Design a protein with these regions (language model features):
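Cysteine-nucleophile active-site neighborhood
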Residues: 63-134
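Hydrophobic anchor at the start of a short beta-strand
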Residues: 41-42, 88, 179
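N-terminal beta1-alpha1 cap of cysteine-dependent amidohydrolase-like domains
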Residues: 1-72, 78-81, 192-196, 200-206
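Amide-donor transfer/coupling interface in amidating biosynthetic enzymes
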Residues: 2-9, 119-206
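Flexible, glycine-rich phosphate/dinucleotide-binding loops
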Residues: 27, 50, 97, 104, ...
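Redox-cofactor binding/interface segments in oxidoreductases and associated redox assembly factors
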Residues: 58, 90, 182
């Protein structure tokens, strides 16, 4: 496994106020990953928490449950507004929530990233697997161990969406400006390169 090669300077660490949506799912491993990088992490459960951060991760989990809880906690419009102004990264179920079309009538995605997704397209829980694929970070192509758990598939990429990672020909990592999505779970490995890449993403210029 490739080791992380980007090291944040001590005087930069306090600048990162990372939020992780903590309604359900795989938020704690993301927290640990960012804390290893010296970041301040907030587990986001309400609008007040959103106001404390400058970037957000929507983690993996059960997308139908996350969808319901977003509405239950009145977070839908605040999340849309946040995603229009600041960096957001969606992993697995988070990718589904950021997409324009989830292919599932039970899910009303946030429609922030111009992609379509298909739930569980790489199989259900018993079909979870890992595969080494290619990612492009800062213009360089490298290998990355990708862990897929009931992973969604990106079925359409919009014109403004850049493919940054592929596995067997499928795009499994993509970026649209200040928004990032991955079908796989980088937080389930010890490789922090994608977490570091997300930290370097800038909000849109106003």
């Amino acid at each position: 496994m490739a080791e992380s090669r980007i090291h944040l300077k001590k005087n930069e660490e306090k600048a990162y106020q990372v939020g992780i949506l903590a309604l359900q799912g795989d938020f704690d491993l993301h927290r640990k990953a960012f804390e290893k990088l010296g970041c301040s992490v907030c587990l986001v459960k309400n609008v007040s928490d959103l106001n404390q951060i400058d970037r957000l991760v929507i983690p993996g989990g059960e997308s139908t449950t996350i969808n319901k809880l977003i509405d239950q906690y009145d977070l839908r419009q605040p999340l849309i507004d946040f995603g229009r102004a600041k960096p957001v990264w969606g992993t697995c179920a988070g990718l589904i929530m950021l997409s324009r079309d989830s292919g599932d009538e039970r899910i009303n995605p946030l429609k922030l990233v111009d992609i379509d997704s298909a739930r569980n397209a790489y199989g259900r829980q018993i079909d979870s697997f890992s595969e080494v694929g290619d990612i492009q970070l800062d213009g360089k192509t490298d290998r990355f161990k990708m862990v897929f758990i009931r992973a969604p598939k990106i079925t359409r990429l919009g014109d403004k969406v850049e493919s940054l990672g592929k596995m067997k020909g499928d795009t499994v990592m993509a970026r649209q400006g200040h928004l990032l999505v991955t079908s796989f779970h980088p937080e389930l490995t010890d490789d922090l390169r994608i977490h570091e890449y997300f930290l370097k993403m800038e909000p849109p210029k106003r």
